[in-house]
Amino acid sequence: MSKARFQLYYWPVPFRGCFVSYLFACRGVPFLEETRLEENKRLMDLNPDEQDVPYMGPPVLYDRETGRTLSQMPAIVLYLSPGLDLAPDDPFELAMCMKVLMDCNDVLMEVCRYNGSSMWDYEAWSEFRTRRLSRWMRIFEEGLARGFVGTDRLSFADIGVFALFGNMTRCLPELEADLLRHAPGIHALCRRVGAVPSLALYVADQEKAYGRLYCGGQIEQSIRKMLAQDEANGPR
């Protein structure tokens, strides 16, 4: 029987689950992953009073030592990070790391149009890519300049930034030029965090398993269609 303390439930794509899995990978801590679509869907579709923790969708973390279950990516990250030496001791610095992580979560929601509630049309996509996404990148770049991330002590905020932009530009390489233009320091930070050997190995294994799948489903098809249209239209 595995001695891993934690089991992570998430779809077979990186997207939001990698904000949790990258914590373990960065520290070389073994954990269990349940990525089967049918099992995640079965658990998600249970009535709230039948679930170990009432939730709408994964990621979900099961602590095999305590028997406790937790949902919501930011809550899971906050729970795990002190034990992995990835959380600051100072309360304000901890809150600032959470601010960065919640910003990451907001970007994910915008990219996938609120969990795929609607698909992209080109007018909306162009507005998002040229205005909102570029502003988000500048917000993160300013956070780096102010020391919210990128300090000598690695934090869950640093890993969150890598999970957001490192994964985004790996899976959707058309957006790397945007990141270099608007947030070159964040681009460099992603490279530095992604070079941690145990994390780099995990990401490589994920790519072998899933290719460059990003968020999956119809919404990923919609995003890729918009990027292809951008490419066909020439330089922005």
Predicted regions, residues:
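Generic structural signal of hydrophobic/aromatic residues within well-ordered alpha-helices
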Residues: 40-43, 50, 111, 189, ...
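Phosphate-coordinating loops and pocket residues in cytosolic domains that bind phosphorylated ligands
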Residues: 195, 204, 216
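A generic membrane alpha-helix/interface feature
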Residues: 46, 171, 176, 214-215
